[in-house]
C-alpha cells in the first residue's frame, strides 16, 4: 500500500473523530454568555414543543412554578406553546438566566418569566412564574405590543452601571412599596412600566414609572439576576410577607432596565387572580 493512501485514510479517520466533537462543543451549554444563550435556545425549543426530553438536566434538577416546588414532568414546560416573543438576560457571575415569554394564543395566552441556573454543562434549576387570563391586569396582546417596542439589547459602555448599582436601583423601587420613600428611587425620564399588560407610558419625554406605586406593602424573598451588559436586573419576590401558617405573598416578577444609573423600563408579572384582589386603595393582595 502506498504511503499516500495510508496518510489519506488516517486523515479521514481523524476528520470523522474531530467533527462530532466540534459539533458537540458548539452545542454545549456553560456559564458564559454564549453557553447560556444555547441553554435558553434549548429551553425555548422545549417549551414550544411541550417536550422536555432533550433538555440537559442535572441529576435531581430543581423545579418550581410560581415559587412552589413542582413535578417537572407534569409542569407547564410540558404544554406546547406558540411563542410570539421571548427575551433574556444573562448573569455570568451567578450562572443564571431570566427569560420573558409572551404567548398571544387566543385559546390559552401566557406571559411568563423563567429563571434557569446552569451548573457547568447542565441545567440545575428551572423556575417559572406564569400568568394567563384572569390574572393581575393580564393582557398578552398589550404586553407584546409594548415589550417589542422597547430596547433591551446590549447597552453602550458609557451608559452601563455596576452590579451593585443595578441591585440598589431594584431594591430602592421595591422598598418604596413599603416605606413610600419615592424620592430614594432613581427615576429616569422617560420611564415606561408594563404591569401584566397595563402601561404607564404616553409617548412623552416626561413619562414616569412613579405612577400607582402603593405604600405599606412588604415585598419579600427577593432574588436577583443581574446583566451588566444590557443594564438589566430581574427580581423574583413575594408581594407581601410569609405568614405563620405557611402562606406567602403573591409570587411576583420585576424586571428593570437601568440606563445611566436611572430606571428606563419596568416589567411586572404577578401570579394573582384578579378575583383574589382585596380592592383596597393600597393594592394589597389577599394573604
Question: Could you tell me what each predicted segment is?
Answer:
Residues 1-10:
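Bacterial N-terminal signal peptides that target proteins for export
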Residues 24-287:
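C-terminal and inter-domain tail/linker signature
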Amino acid at each position: 500500500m502506498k504511503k499516500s493512501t495510508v496518510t489519506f485514510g488516517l486523515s479521514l479517520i481523524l476528520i470523522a473523530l474531530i467533527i462530532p466533537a466540534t459539533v458537540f462543543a458548539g452545542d454545549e451549554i456553560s456559564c458564559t454568555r454564549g453557553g447560556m444563550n444555547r441553554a435558553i435556545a434549548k429551553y425555548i425549543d422545549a417549551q414550544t414543543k411541550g417536550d422536555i426530553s432533550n433538555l440537559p438536566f442535572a441529576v435531581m434538577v430543581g423545579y418550581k412554578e410560581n415559587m412552589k416546588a413542582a413535578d417537572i414532568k407534569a409542569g407547564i414546560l410540558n404544554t406546547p406553546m406558540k411563542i410570539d416573543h421571548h427575551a433574556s438576560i444573562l448573569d455570568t457571575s451567578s450562572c443564571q438566566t431570566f427569560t420573558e415569554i409572551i404567548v398571544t394564543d387566543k385559546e390559552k395566552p401566557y406571559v411568563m418569566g423563567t429563571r434557569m441556573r446552569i451548573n457547568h454543562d447542565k441545567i440545575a434549576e428551572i423556575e417559572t412564574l406564569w400568568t394567563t387570563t384572569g390574572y393581575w391586569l393580564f393582557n398578552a396582546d398589550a404586553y407584546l405590543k409594548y415589550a417589542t417596542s422597547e430596547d433591551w439589547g446590549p447597552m453602550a459602555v458609557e451608559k452601563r452601571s455596576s452590579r451593585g448599582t443595578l441591585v440598589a436601583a431594584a431594591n430602592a423601587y421595591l422598598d418604596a412599596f413599603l416605606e413610600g420613600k419615592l424620592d430614594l428611587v432613581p427615576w429616569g425620564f422617560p420611564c415606561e412600566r408594563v404591569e401584566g399588560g397595563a402601561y404607564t407610558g404616553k409617548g412623552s419625554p416626561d413619562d414616569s414609572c412613579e405612577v400607582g406605586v402603593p405604600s405599606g406593602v412588604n415585598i419579600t424573598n427577593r432574588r436577583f439576576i443581574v446583566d451588566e451588559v444590557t443594564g438589566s436586573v430581574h427580581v423574583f419576590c413575594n408581594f407581601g410577607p410569609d405568614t405563620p401558617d405557611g402562606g406567602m405573598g403573591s409570587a411576583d416578577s420585576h424586571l428593570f432596565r437601568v440606563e445611566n444609573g436611572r430606571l428606563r423600563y419596568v416589567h411586572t408579572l404577578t401570579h394573582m387572580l384578579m378575583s383574589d384582589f382585596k380592592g383596597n386603595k393600597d393594592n394589597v393582595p389577599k394573604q
